[in-house]
């Protein structure tokens, strides 16, 4: 046990976590030179293309230290995006230590702080690493100072390294061996193992990534899952180094995989404790808090006969992504589909992209919304995540919207722009601190404003330097209304929005004029209206295309022409009564692009 070290790598987006993981794997001989490629642990195509990590991945390595002993290192690479912060906390709870990677040219950023606090809360030893010191713009002294000022941990012994060139990677491993404590645990006690992650493999069923806390786990053991009380027979165990290798057993303190022929991911819940049937553990390990979706959107197949295949795709995707939630819903405009819950906008984009790529789905997505709490006249509280389901105004006492606490780090030069943006988004400033070149802003903001396009705007008004981290705070009463779009006086439920009353007029006008550009011309006039309740706030018309029925009358009597025009008029009137307007996919996306 003394020779085991479990550690994760935590950092802000693009500070070089995955590159550092590559270097460490290479140095420990986990892969030969031929198999080495950039971002070894990022296994999905999307992760590679976007250059981000989505799923935490592990590697078990052996390292011969300078003191001549051989240590077993279990490395877990974690994501940096705020949407995937729960992956970070899961990885950290399986470790005794963490490498806090900070880009020496950028300094401390929002996720650095958030992830580091998560680590400190879980009582994990944090080893600061200053990466990218080969860059001409690197300023290690300043970065050191920022770590001490902002986070408050001692950075005097921070390791200087460059993951790109491989400089200082050995020093990092020496620091891991020297400063991170070995795992505590008793190999002779009854088995207790924590499920850190689980995913579906087409050949063997569900693969569980576990951290063994006490006892040993070996094939042919009868396993008991403590939360679901399911029983399974263990088929094989092993480790990822980073390729999977079978082992005879996993002992206390080790991180590895367990396969037990489960076909349902529900049985292997992340955060559950595994024990054996013959020697049961008395109490389960503290798991993780269930992650709640923050953003909801409707996903509909373009062809209505694709509904079943979309359902199967979502089921398969959920096997790999425990935080995705979905339930069937029906829309008058779009037919049958699903209401899906996501952790944030990036998560939503990635799920959509994976459905389109890996499962060949053609999708229509509705605008993302957050969950509102509605207090009814009779005192009951309901949660509404779909604008079309908002009850009638006469039955509601008040609507409460979710408020978040946003922590923003921004260089001083862009401070004004960021404050202006936060005020436009109905933000309330709570705190502001200067740390060297950086300013730390704390704002309370409505989640609905952050969901739409806040992140993109924050990046563009600070030339990409500002960084954001947010946490849910509470529900607060808000003056919000439901904005409906009517096309030929028919409500289109998929275009409904819940907006703040102050923005409603403007959003209504913008949306109506956007729709006018996107809806193709018909043989009759199409009226597009934006309404709050029964009050119409804006109207646009799509002019009819007109066939020239008088083309064949050269000269001749006026009554002849009148007869033809009347006939055309009657035809158009009849057409307008029965005709329905096709709404193109772009129109649904237009809702997303209306600026506040």
Curated annotation (Swiss-Prot):
Protein location: Cell inner membrane
Entry's EC annotation: 3.6.5.n1
Domain of life: Bacteria
Position of the signal peptide: none
Record's keyword annotation contains Magnesium: no
InterPro entries registered for this protein in UniProt: EF-4, EFG_III/V, EFG_V-like, EFTu-like_2, G_TR_CS, LepA_C_sf, LepA_CTD, LepA_IV
Binding site for GTP: 14-19, 131-134
A Pfam short name: EFG_C
Reaction(s) the record says it catalyses: GTP + H2O = GDP + phosphate + H(+)
Gene3D superfamilies xref list: 3.30.70.240, Elongation factor 4, C-terminal domain (3.30.70.2570), Elongation Factor G (Translational Gtpase), domain 3 (3.30.70.870), P-loop containing nucleotide triphosphate hydrolases (3.40.50.300), Translation factors (2.40.30.10)
Main location: membrane
Positions of the tr-type G domain: 2-184
Similarity annotation: Belongs to the TRAFAC class translation factor GTPase superfamily. Classic translation factor GTPase family. LepA subfamily.
Function: Required for accurate and efficient protein synthesis under certain stress conditions. May act as a fidelity factor of the translation reaction, by catalyzing a one-codon backward translocation of tRNAs on improperly translocated ribosomes. Back-translocation proceeds from a post-translocation (POST) complex to a pre-translocation (PRE) complex, thus giving elongation factor G a second chance to translocate the tRNAs correctly. Binds to ribosomes in a GTP-dependent manner.
Protein name: Elongation factor 4
